[in-house]
């Protein structure tokens, strides 16, 4: 299965910057604490925690830092009264956008999310307005350089659902989200070194963006990710190589 414009299409990835990394770490720690508080500290019995651990390690968080976060959650961190909130909406060019938040104040969060949509020509939708276009999956990513057949055989043996090979040679292995950790363990044991592993929302359809709407979508994503309450942003925007070259 071939793919194209990987990072522009499935989930916007910005260049790593020190300030951005600090914000990413804060958000990952918040997710680790919440996942451990809600489901316990054993990643083998808590898929949400295992996914958060994989994401933390993919972002080079130290074991000491993530273990302290888990301990806070298991210990019933009194300061952590966060709840997961999912917002849905339409972005520039008719793109479907899902915004995953962890917040202790719904009013603040929805105000920030709505502002981002409004400023970029989109609109916040109701529950179910676009979620039917996305499927929750585990994604294990490999950098270019691996043989497709090697990864395919190992992935199928490990119980993965599918793999996607991109034009640049990068490979994504897709799993049921609850099986992400178990599949990754099997792939790790074969010697395949993953570049990242996370739970993601995968769109079933794509919305092609032109040179006018693509920058607006990227601005929407930037505004949303700048909110401390926003954990992840998913969309179905398709940005061609030709359009990307103009950005």
From Swiss-Prot:
Cell location: Cytoplasm
Keyword Lipid metabolism recorded: no
The entry's keywords: Cytoplasm, DNA-binding, Transcription, Transcription regulation
UniProt-listed InterPro entries: Integrase-like_N (IPR017856), TACO1_YebC-like_2nd/3rd_dom (IPR048300), TACO1_YebC_N (IPR049083), Transcrip_reg_TACO1-like (IPR002876), Transcrip_reg_TACO1-like_dom3 (IPR026564), YebC-like (IPR029072)
One Pfam family recorded for the sequence: TACO1_YebC_N
GO biological process, one term: regulation of DNA-templated transcription
GO cellular component: cytosol
Signal peptide start-end: none
GO molecular-function term, one example from the UniProt record: DNA binding
Name of the molecule in the record: Probable transcriptional regulatory protein YPK_2146
Organism: Yersinia pseudotuberculosis serotype O:3 (strain YPIII)
């Amino acid at each position: 299965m071939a793919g194209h414009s990987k990072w522009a299409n499935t989930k916007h990835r910005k260049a790593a910057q020190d300030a951005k990394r600090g914000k990413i770490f804060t958000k990952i720690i918040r997710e680790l604490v919440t996942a451990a508080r809600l489901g316990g500290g054993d990643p083998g019995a808590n898929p949400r925690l295992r996914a958060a651990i994989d994401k933390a390690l993919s972002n080079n968080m130290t074991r000491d830092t993530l273990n302290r976060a888990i301990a806070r959650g298991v210990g019933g961190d009194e300061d952590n009264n966060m709840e997961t909130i999912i917002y849905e909406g339409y972005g520039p060019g008719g793109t479907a956008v899902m915004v995953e938040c962890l917040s202790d104040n719904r009013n603040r969060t929805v105000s920030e999310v709505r502002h981002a949509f409004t400023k970029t020509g989109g609109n916040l939708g109701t529950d179910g307005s676009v979620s039917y276009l996305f499927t929750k999956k585990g994604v294990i990513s490999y950098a270019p350089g691996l043989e497709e057949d090697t990864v395919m055989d190992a992935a199928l043996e490990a119980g993965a659902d599918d793999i996607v090979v991109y034009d640049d040679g990068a490979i994504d292995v897709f799993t049921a989200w609850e099986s992400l950790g178990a599949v990754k363990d099997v792939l790790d044991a074969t010697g395949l070194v993953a570049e990242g592993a996370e739970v993601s929302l995968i769109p079933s359809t794509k919305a092609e963006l032109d040179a006018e709407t693509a920058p607006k979508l990227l601005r929407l994503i930037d505004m949303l990710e700048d909110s401390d309450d926003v954990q992840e942003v998913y969309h179905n925007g398709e940005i061609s190589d030709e359009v990307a070259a103009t950005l």
